[in-house]
Amino acid sequence: MMAADMIESCIKRTLQAFEKWLQKGGKSTDYMVPIGISAMINVVIDAKNQSLKLCAVDGIDVHQYHTKIDEFLEKVSQQMIRGLVQKLISVLENVLGKLARYDEGSVFAPIFNFTSQINISKVLNPASSSQNPPANELGLSYVNFIRANLEIFHQKINDELWILGLFEYWYTQTMNAICDWLTDRLDLSLHPYQMTCLGLIVKKTYSEFEIQGAPEVCLRSKTYQTIYARMQMEEANVHLKMEGGTGGERMFPARGEENDY
């Protein structure tokens, strides 16, 4: 009982510190999860692994009180996942907010249309335009943000199952946020810059989380399929407006034609 009390007290302090850490840092794509956050996650993971040894005899709980510490630790673990993903999603929301400036009817869209004629082939074939500024720098910066933080989690967190749970929730919330953003624009056609950036984000988010082992049932959720169908339509519109609707590789090909999205 004393061991359980000590664990609970320690984890409560750890959670308080964790929540304070999440309040630090901005919402830009330069954000990288601090080592301190990973360390506190590992404290909870280690406590879960050690609680059975400390609060049981011969691997059998001697009192129901001791099983409560396991429930408490699981609750804290899930709370950490939700809090961390909320922080990560705030970066995506910041990116989506910037893309919203290009909405039809906004004061920015005509300016950007005048200053740059975006060619979607620069996104699909970046090597062919390596001497020019990227047409989707905001999308690229977000993809780099995802990759950097995925790597941090793999290097700094000690439990693969915990990491997988984090990744599944992060991916799901990412697709939910993107789908909501698109739903708010059902009556609007996406600006070419919105299309190229968002298309890259959707495509690379899928592939990065697929590499990390996210299950197909999570990756190809109904939300993702809704996004995919919308992006197919928007991409077709961009090709039609800018290339006459002929030729060009597609980021969102018809089902059965895709190789890697």
Enumerate the predicted regions with their spans:
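Extended alpha-helical "rod" scaffolds
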Residues: 3-261
